[in-house]
């Protein structure tokens, strides 16, 4: 009897255990179903807000591009003001007083002492109104070019791998043998964003000119007090109205082609240097990996280095046209008899004659101090914001 009771109790325990296991399994299944439903709802929510993943990416690049530029401009704009003043003060050789600033440090001290620290942000509003949307569009085009270029194997080798010489040789052999690399859909895909970037940059340079003219005149007019340049605390809007009143609406777009001469090569050098540096660093940090090992990703420091190099190369190679641009767009602050520049060639000859070739690099150190960390910070912030959103 005792054995029978024991058997019954054992059976009951087994049944209870089985029931508990079944209940646990049911609970797990219910949890899995709930998780799946939540995932489906989340996907539906994302799809309702972003119907197309590519549109979502474009929005991310727009936000990251404008956000990175906002961070960079807040930190670095004072250096842009100092750079503009140093470049402009060469015009005093046509006035009645000598150069006011002896260098970067002296310019900072003099400006803050005589006008206050906020004067370093004079012209910031017209600058921001342009650079935020322009930066957003530039980064969207840049991402499109990179993604489309990576679809083409040979283009990828030439642009993104360190073994680019071999790819160039192969491409040349294809052409010599009667083949055409342009038939690749990847290369056609690359041409479109490059074309879009070019058109966007041309349009942007023209539209940027009024903001640049107002910004630079505000930057220089506050401190250069002599019989030619009067001190003013006018707003950006009032400065624009004054230009229109004096020179008409075309005064805001004067020498817009000079902006184009600077911006197009700068953009090409800027983004290509950044991408080359990033991919070269990827090659360096992953060259010791064995087959099957996960590739290491670039850190914020790597992005900072790449961005800084891009800014350094772009700035150094385009500084002569930047000096000419500043002089052309600010000389209207002087009386008509003191305006000796009629265009790029005229400005180039005048600067060489009176200041030598060194005059074409005026403000380079300040511009490098401004652009190099600005570019590094901008790309670093861009990659970080993009990582957060994607």
Swiss-Prot record:
Subcellular location(s): the record lists:
Mitochondrion inner membrane
Q: Which InterPro entries match?
A: Mitochondrial_sb/sol_carrier, Mt_carrier_dom_sf
Sorted alphabetically, which keywords does the UniProt record give? Membrane, Mitochondrion, Mitochondrion inner membrane, Repeat, Transmembrane, Transmembrane helix, Transport
Which parts are the Solcar repeats?
56-148, 188-280, 298-388
The yes or no answer to whether the keyword Transcription is present is no
Spell out the Low complexity composition-biased ranges.
13-35
Q: Which Pfam families match?
A: Mito_carr
Q: Which residue ranges does the record annotate as region Disordered?
A: 1-35
Pull the Mitochondrial intermembrane topological domain ranges from the record. 1-57, 146-186, 272-303, 382-390
Q: Which residues cross the membrane?
A: 58-78, 125-145, 187-207, 251-271, 304-324, 371-381
This protein's superkingdom?
A: Eukaryota
PROSITE patterns reported for this sequence: SOLCAR
Residues in compartment: Mitochondrial matrix:
79-124, 208-250, 325-370
A single GO CC term, please?
Answer: mitochondrial inner membrane
Q: How does it sit in the membrane?
A: Multi-pass membrane protein
Q: Which regions are flagged for Polar residues bias? A: 1-12
| Gene3D superfamilies named among the record's database cross-references | Mitochondrial carrier domain (1.50.40.10)
> Main site of residence?
mitochondrion
Q: Which GO terms describe its molecular function?
A: iron ion transmembrane transporter activity
Which family does the record assign? Belongs to the mitochondrial carrier (TC 2.A.29) family.
Q: Provide the function of this protein.
A: Mitochondrial solute carriers shuttle metabolites, nucleotides, and cofactors through the mitochondrial inner membrane.
Entries under PANTHER family matching the protein = MITOCHONDRIAL SUBSTRATE CARRIER FAMILY PROTEIN U, MITOFERRIN-1-RELATED
Specify the protein name.
Answer: Mitochondrial substrate carrier family protein U
């Amino acid at each position: 009897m005792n054995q029978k009771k024991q058997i019954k109790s054992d059976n009951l325990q087994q049944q209870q255990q089985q029931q508990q296991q079944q209940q646990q399994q049911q609970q797990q299944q219910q949890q899995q179903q709930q998780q799946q439903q939540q995932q489906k709802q989340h996907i539906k929510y994302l799809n309702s807000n972003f119907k197309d993943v590519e549109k979502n990416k474009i929005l991310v690049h727009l936000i990251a591009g404008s956000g990175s530029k906002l961070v960079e401009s807040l930190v670095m704009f004072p250096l842009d003001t100092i750079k503009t003043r140093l470049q402009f003060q060469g015009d005093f050789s046509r006035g009645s007083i000598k150069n006011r600033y002896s260098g970067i440090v002296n310019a900072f001290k003099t400006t803050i002492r005589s006008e206050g620290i906020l004067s370093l942000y004079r012209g910031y509003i017209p600058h921001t109104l342009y650079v935020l949307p322009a930066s957003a569009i530039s980064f969207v085009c840049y991402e499109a070019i990179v993604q489309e270029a990576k679809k083409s194997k040979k283009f990828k080798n030439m642009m993104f791998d360190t073994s680019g010489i071999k790819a160039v040789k192969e491409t040349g052999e294809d052409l010599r043998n009667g083949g055409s690399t342009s038939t690749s859909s990847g290369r056609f895909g690359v041409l479109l964003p490059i074309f879009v970037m070019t058109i966007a940059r041309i349009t942007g340079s023209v539209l940027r000119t009024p903001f640049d003219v107002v910004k630079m005149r505000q930057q220089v007019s506050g401190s250069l007090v002599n019989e030619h340049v009067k001190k003013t605390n006018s707003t950006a809007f009032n400065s624009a109205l004054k230009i229109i009143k004096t020179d008409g609406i075309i005064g805001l777009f004067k020498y817009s082609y000079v902006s184009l001469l600077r911006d197009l090569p700068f953009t090409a050098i800027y983004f290509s240097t950044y991408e080359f540096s990033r991919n070269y660093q990827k090659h360096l940090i992953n060259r010791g990996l064995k087959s099957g090992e996960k590739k290491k990703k670039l850190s914020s420091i790597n992005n900072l280095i790449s961005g800084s190099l891009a800014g350094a190369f772009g700035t150094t190679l385009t500084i002569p046209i930047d000096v000419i641009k500043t002089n052309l767009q600010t000389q209207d602050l002087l009386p008509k008899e003191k305006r000796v520049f009629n265009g790029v060639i005229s400005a180039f000859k005048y600067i060489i004659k009176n200041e030598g070739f060194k005059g074409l690099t005026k403000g380079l150190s300040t511009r490098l101090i401004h652009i190099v960390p600005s570019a590094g910070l901008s790309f670093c912030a861009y990659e970080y914001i993009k990582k957060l959103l994607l």
